[in-house]
Amino acid sequence: MNLFRFLGDLSHLLAIILLLLKIWKSRSCAGISGKSQVLFAVVFTARYLDLFTNYISLYNTCMKVVYIACSFTTVWMIYSKFKATYDGNHDTFRVEFLVVPTAILAFLVNHDFTPLEILWTFSIYLESVAILPQLFMVSKTGEAETITSHYLFALGVYRTLYLFNWIWRYHFEGFFDLIAIVAGLVQTVLYCDFFYLYITKVLKGKKLSLPA
């Protein structure tokens, strides 16, 4: 494992922990898109169905378990534990426009036409756009809480570091995964505007709000 992947995993884990702490400490999921969190739960479930059949390392297995457990815990808190605080009126993105195309694409473009490989490919495609409901929600409300901004920034950093991970692997290992790289680029591009607002506002102590 290279440094970029390790730091990317840490950033991803930090994002998940920030979100869980935000919801638990405030006893509220206001400003959080339940739809994005459901999509992430689907992503991790589809990607890590090989948990019991493909052992790589203790680190890899532990991270898989943590991602799955945390994603479903987040969904549970939003739709059950703190559902009274869930802002469904603003969480209105049509997720079928993300799930259906990525599922079809996974069947058409994959590395190997087997159930686990298709599910893995589907998870890669879906993860690249799973944050859209959250970004759409922020655009509808016009602002985001600081902790939510930190969560989104950490997710963006995770994807950016993973792009460097692919570059590193290609240069030093000759490994090239076009599906993962293209999906990672798409996901990183989606964060670009948010990165700018985060750097120019949140890091200066201001609340993240969209231009009128």
From Swiss-Prot:
Keywords: Cytoplasmic vesicle, Endoplasmic reticulum, ER-Golgi transport, Golgi apparatus, Membrane, Phosphoprotein, Protein transport, Receptor, Transmembrane, Transmembrane helix, Transport. It is found in: Golgi apparatus membrane; Cytoplasmic vesicle, COPI-coated vesicle membrane; Endoplasmic reticulum membrane; Endoplasmic reticulum-Golgi intermediate compartment membrane. It comes from the Eukaryota. GO terms for cellular component: cis-Golgi network; COPI-coated vesicle membrane; endoplasmic reticulum; endoplasmic reticulum membrane; endoplasmic reticulum-Golgi intermediate compartment membrane; Golgi apparatus; Golgi membrane. The keyword Cell cycle does not apply. Residues 204-207 are annotated as: Important for recycling of cargo proteins with the sequence motif K-D-E-L from the Golgi to the endoplasmic reticulum. It is a multi-pass membrane protein. GO terms for molecular function: KDEL sequence binding. GO terms for biological process: protein retention in ER lumen; protein transport; retrograde vesicle-mediated transport, Golgi to endoplasmic reticulum; T cell apoptotic process; T cell differentiation. Residues 1-4, 53-58, 111-116, 169-178 are lumenal. PROSITE patterns: ER_LUMEN_RECEPTOR_1, ER_LUMEN_RECEPTOR_2. The chain crosses the membrane at residues 5-24, 33-52, 59-79, 93-110, 117-135, 150-168, 179-199. Residues 47-48, 159-169 are annotated as: Interaction with the K-D-E-L motif on target proteins. Its main location: Golgi. InterPro entries: ER_ret_rcpt. Phosphorylation by PKA at Ser-209 is required for endoplasmic reticulum retention function. The modification Phosphoserine is found at S209. The record marks R5, E117 as: Interaction with the K-D-E-L motif on target proteins. Coiled coil: none annotated. Receptor for the C-terminal sequence motif K-D-E-L that is present on endoplasmic reticulum resident proteins and that mediates their recycling from the Golgi back to the endoplasmic reticulum. Belongs to the ERD2 family. Upon ligand binding the receptor oligomerizes and interacts with components of the transport machinery such as ARFGAP1 and ARF1. This is ER lumen protein-retaining receptor 1. It comes from Mus musculus (Mouse). The gene is Kdelr1.
